[in-house]
Amino acid sequence: MDLFISSQLLLLLVFCLFLFWNFKPSSQNKLPPGKTGWPIIGETLEFISCGQKGNPEKFVTQRMNKYSPDVFTTSLAGEKMVVFCGASGNKFIFSNENKLVVSWWPPAISKILTATIPSVEKSKALRSLIVEFLKPEALHKFISVMDRTTRQHFEDKWNGSTEVKAFAMSESLTFELACWLLFSINDPVQVQKLSHLFEKVKAGLLSLPLNFPGTAFNRGIKAANLIRKELSVVIKQRRSDKLQTRKDLLSHVMLSNGEGEKFFSEMDIADVVLNLLIASHDTTSSAMGSVVYFLADHPHIYAKVLTEQMEIAKSKGAEELLSWEDIKRMKYSRNVINEAMRLVPPSQGGFKVVTSKFSYANFIIPKGWKIFWSVYSTHKDPKYFKNPEEFDPSRFEGDGPMPFTFIPFGGGPRMCPGSEFARLEVLIFMHHLVTNFKWEKVFPNEKIIYTPFPFPENGLPIRLSPCTL
């Protein structure tokens, strides 16, 4: 009897071991570690709070240290989300665009920014046209317009002033440039009208997605529709005047319009222009503001930029505009822009959605889950950037940072097509700024907060004095 019981217990033990080894949760079947926080809200409030306190990287770095340096789970914007970290994570996500992941935006943002849902073929065709219009080798055609507009901006709004709010100035300039280069509007009244609507759109994008009359979200939707209406009028005028050719994005898209799936309606085109208006405005104005911010803190770097820009200025006639050759000479200034965007990235990251289940770092990433890649998993990591809190443009000399560590505009097939366009705007802005002024911050320790775009909490007021070199 005892032998029978013992044999039964032995068989039971063997069976349990069999189940344990064959059906235990494998690391390959585990979700990435982390927490999803409160229902619906998730960890969104904590994410926002870190940005508003001027420390957006805290949300990412704390969780990397607590859960995994490669990938962790959270919940943002009402979605279960996996955050990919480090250069390897960035490389994986950017290299698998249209294979395992595709670009995605929270529904609240899409509600404001898109009036139509274009087909896959139409989306690809539209993006191809944008990339072609903004490709680096085509940038030379924008220089004269950018330079002329920027020069006039400084004459109208900076000259004769002893103090300005630099961030508001950068926003004003980038909006003027965007209106002209995207759809050739430069009438001050019309630009001001669009700017007023644009501010409502931005406020709506940053608000709770409550679509009731009187809410910022509702006002944002209405303002976006009014901008589309204004653009539709321009599109109709442009179509009726077929002999008129302009070198703006609107004409580029309209002249390339195809048939069937590649035919773009007025709303398709208006959506594209609205999206580019927002993307070009926030990234560029942020970079301009950051350059002003850091050059005020580092006189020796300002002096190097001034020397470089003065050499170019002295080689020009009084009314002669900048050329492509001049832009290519602005090497140190370009490094300054890159370092400013490393410390204060124009965007905190981007979203993707998983189209096919896959494993990464021994964790499973389910189909349908959302992914967030963050600039902060690399931009301030001492593993990639020595003394990461220091402002040091020399990091970008020679070969510069290792691949997939400096990603202010993303990477891969969905990398922001306007990255070089934005740098060009900032370089021309820097040229006119440093050759005319030196400055100091009114609030020396002014903090940069994120809402979610970077913004100096006091608007970056600066005291101006004439350049003396």
UniProtKB/Swiss-Prot annotation:
- Write out the GO cellular component annotations: membrane
Q: Where is this protein localized, as stated in its record? A: Membrane
**InterPro entries per the record?**
Cyt_P450, Cyt_P450_CS, Cyt_P450_E_grp-I, Cyt_P450_sf
* Tissue expression from the record: Accumulates ubiquitously in all organs of plants, including roots, stems and leaves.
- Keywords for the protein's UniProt record, in alphabetical order: Heme, Iron, Isoprene biosynthesis, Membrane, Metal-binding, Monooxygenase, Oxidoreductase, Transmembrane, Transmembrane helix
Q: How is its activity regulated?
A: Activated by N,N'-dicyclohexylcarbodiimide (DCCD) thus leading to increased ginsenosides accumulation.
Q: What Enzyme Commission number(s) appear in the record?
A: 1.14.14.121
Give residues annotated as binding heme.
416
Where is it chiefly localized? Answer: membrane
Instruction: State the Gene Ontology BP annotations.
Output: response to molecule of fungal origin; sterol metabolic process; terpenoid biosynthetic process
| Family from the record | Belongs to the cytochrome P450 family.
Name under which the protein is recorded? Protopanaxadiol 6-hydroxylase
Organism of derivation: Panax ginseng
